[in-house]
Amino acid sequence: YNGSEVSVEPDGSVYPCCVKTKLPIGSLLEDELIAILDSLAGEPAYEAITMGHPERMGIAHGWSEAKFVERSATVTPKGAPYRNLCIGCDRFHEEVLGPILEAARARRRAMRAAGLASRRQPVPTADVER
């Protein structure tokens, strides 16, 4: 996982980069981080992010770099044009990666059920006394 970066939210959600995308790639409440990363290893979209080229994340799924850049455009609340690759990434997650992430989650769940996952358990969230 050299060069890869993930973000983890307090609720256990794991995101594929330094900022939150529309869909988490998994949850530490369900799986260990390595299991989540292993389940998506080789997925071209995440390989592109890891290599520092998010604009290439859709090529294997029919999104050219030009389409990705086009889908990265929006308009600010004041009506000014704005473009950011993170917007394209969010749209790609919404439109394409949802079923891929769900399939990876189902594979991890099946491995757990079959006893093939690591014997270590995810770290439980701490109970906070009020």
Segments and roles (model prediction):
Residues 51, 92, 110-130:
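Short Fe-S-cluster ligation motifs
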Residues 32, 101-113:
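Short cysteine/histidine-rich metal-coordination sites, predominantly Zn2+-binding motifs
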Residues 13, 19-76:
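C-terminal accessory region of radical SAM enzymes
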Residues 15-17, 96-97:
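Short active-site-adjacent structural elements
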Residues 1-2:
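Short, small/polar residue-rich loop motifs at catalytic or cofactor-binding pockets
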Residues 8-9:
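Short, acidic, Ser/Thr-enriched surface-loop or helix-capping motifs
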Residues 61-104:
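Cysteine-cluster motifs in flexible loop/terminal segments that predominantly coordinate metals
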